[in-house]
Amino acid sequence: MSPDLLGALLVAAGYLAGSIPFGVVLGRLVLGVDVRTVGSGNIGATNVARAGGKKMGVLVLVLDAAKAIVPILVARRVLGGTPHAEFWVTAVAVAAFVGHLFPVWLGFKGGKGVATGLGIFAVLAPWAALAGLVGYAVAYGLTRISSVGSLTGTALCAAGGFATYGPRHPVSWAGLAIALLIFVRHRENIRRLVRGEEKKV
């Protein structure tokens, strides 16, 4: 099998892995609720924490990050040393992220991508991920508003990706695209922030 065909198959697998809706699955199995019907209706860690407590929220956060981390690590191992390996590994990362936002299992209606994006940066640009985590902690600590922390951390991750790789590397542009999509998915949160109506967590 050619490396490019293998890369394409890994991209498809990355999308399917990213599509696993851990928030919905654990909500039903552990909490007995569909998290899409409570709180904000989002399937991510913050809304799961609202429905089932902080421990459940942390578990979903870890799993949503892992569903990007695992496909990326597999792609690195399988494609390491082959032509275009960097491109395909980055494509697998983006596919996992897109899977979370548009999961085939939920009619393409998914989450906002913060945890999955963090998982991607943790593997491809660890220092950027660290900057994002610090940014989240500081912004959330000052405001007690989850979306402010998430957006701050996302912006720092994207900036850190460019600082790590420069403007010509696929990871830099993938990171920027991921950050822009996260901001788009938070557009209602941003509107509420502007109006002073965003809830504290």
Curated annotation (Swiss-Prot):
Primary location group: membrane
GO molecular function: acyl-phosphate glycerol-3-phosphate acyltransferase activity
Reaction it catalyzes: an acyl phosphate + sn-glycerol 3-phosphate = a 1-acyl-sn-glycero-3-phosphate + phosphate
Keyword Lipid metabolism among record annotations: yes
Record GO cellular component, one term: plasma membrane
InterPro entries assigned to the protein according to its UniProt record, in alphabetical order: G3P_acylTferase_PlsY
Keywords tagged on the record: Cell inner membrane, Cell membrane, Lipid biosynthesis, Lipid metabolism, Membrane, Phospholipid biosynthesis, Phospholipid metabolism, Transferase, Transmembrane, Transmembrane helix
Pathway: Lipid metabolism; phospholipid metabolism
Subcellular location: Cell inner membrane
Keyword Zinc included in the entry's annotation: no
One example of a Gene Ontology biological process annotation: phospholipid biosynthetic process
Listed transmembrane segments: 5-25, 55-75, 87-107, 118-138, 164-184
Superkingdom of the organism of origin: Bacteria
UniProt function note: Catalyzes the transfer of an acyl group from acyl-phosphate (acyl-PO(4)) to glycerol-3-phosphate (G3P) to form lysophosphatidic acid (LPA). This enzyme utilizes acyl-phosphate as fatty acyl donor, but not acyl-CoA or acyl-ACP.
NCBIfam families: glycerol-3-phosphate 1-O-acyltransferase PlsY (TIGR00023)
Subunit note: Probably interacts with PlsX.
Family designation: Belongs to the PlsY family.
Official protein name in the record: Glycerol-3-phosphate acyltransferase
Lineage of origin: Bacteria, Pseudomonadati, Myxococcota, Myxococcia, Myxococcales
Gene behind this protein: plsY
